[in-house]
């Protein structure tokens, strides 16, 4: 793969998100689409909890460019369809969520799963199968505790499997802790991060800015394989 010069590292607080990652035992690298902070306004103060990075399979740029090349970063940022095309795109994604402060696994997954259920209900994809998948999802986190710097990895396949891995740092574990085969849930995880009601507007902005550059570079160098 020829690496576009615009694929660079991103720093979110004290967290470093490298431009490329290769999971253990794999020959496939994923490039950093964007990264940003997730936080909440608590008593008029923005409290930062997590840094989120979205990595994608290399063919994602050319896949998305067919529809989105020529758009400005602002146009991409304002287009929900752009983010939905990332979420539903026919390429693998690896999401890294690293903690900026200590979070209890049960409390963390309670909020994440509530957001996922709310989205699936709003688009009519929440049924008995998704309810079972949410239960699996919650169970995977029940014995976890996340100190600062620790990480949850979500690996998403185009077929709908969601792999979960936990690490005490940014290292990708060799083996996944759990694999859940449910496409609506897998898509909902990323939807809640960068979709219509995102937990990380900063991540959305990073994706728009960086993909605008990726598309420009692809247009200038159409022989780049992404």
Curated annotation (Swiss-Prot):
Residues the entry annotates as binding substrate: 50, 115, 192
Catalytic activity of the protein: a chalcone = a flavanone
InterPro entries: CFI, Chalcone_isomerase, Chalcone_isomerase_3-sand, Chalcone_isomerase_bundle_sf, Chalcone_isomerase_sf
Keywords: Flavonoid biosynthesis, Isomerase
Domain of life the protein comes from: Eukaryota
One GO MF term: chalcone isomerase activity
EC main group: isomerase
GO BP term (any one): flavonoid biosynthetic process
Site annotation Important for catalytic activity: residues: 108
EC number annotated for this UniProt entry: 5.5.1.6
Pathway(s) where this gene product acts: Secondary metabolite biosynthesis; flavonoid biosynthesis
Disulfide bonds: none
Additional note from the record: Part of the biosynthetic pathway for all classes of flavonoids, a large class of secondary plant metabolites, many of which are brightly colored.
Entry similarity comment: Belongs to the chalcone isomerase family.
Function: Catalyzes the intramolecular cyclization of bicyclic chalcones into tricyclic (S)-flavanones. Responsible for the isomerization of 4,2',4',6'-tetrahydroxychalcone (also termed chalcone) into naringenin.
PANTHER family: CHALCONE--FLAVANONE ISOMERASE 1B-1, CHALCONE--FLAVONONE ISOMERASE 1-RELATED
Descriptive protein name: Chalcone--flavanone isomerase 1B-1
Gene of this entry: CHI1B1
């Amino acid at each position: 793969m020829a690496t576009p010069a615009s694929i660079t590292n991103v720093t979110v607080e004290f967290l470093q998100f490298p431009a490329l990652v290769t999971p253990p035992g794999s020959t496939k690298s994923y490039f950093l689409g964007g990264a940003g902070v997730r936080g909440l306004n608590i008593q008029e103060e923005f409290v930062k909890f997590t840094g989120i990075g979205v990595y994608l399979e290399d063919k994602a740029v050319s896949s998305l460019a067919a529809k989105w090349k020529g758009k400005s970063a602002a146009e991409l940022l304002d287009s929900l369809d752009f983010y939905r095309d990332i979420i539903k795109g026919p390429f693998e994604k690896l999401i890294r969520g690293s903690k900026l402060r200590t979070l209890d696994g049960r409390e963390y997954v309670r909020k994440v799963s509530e957001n996922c259920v709310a989205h699936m209900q709003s688009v009519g994809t929440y049924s008995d199968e998704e309810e079972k998948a949410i239960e699996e999802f919650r169970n995977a986190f029940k014995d976890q505790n996340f100190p600062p710097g620790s990480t949850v990895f979500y690996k998403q396949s185009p077929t709908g499997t969601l792999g979960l891995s936990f690490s005490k740092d940014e290292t990708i574990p060799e083996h996944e802790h759990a694999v859940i085969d449910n496409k609506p849930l897998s898509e909902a995880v990323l939807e809640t991060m960068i979709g219509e009601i995102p937990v990380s507007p900063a991540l959305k902005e990073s994706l728009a800015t960086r993909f605008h550059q990726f598309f420009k570079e692809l247009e200038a160098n159409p022989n780049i394989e992404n």
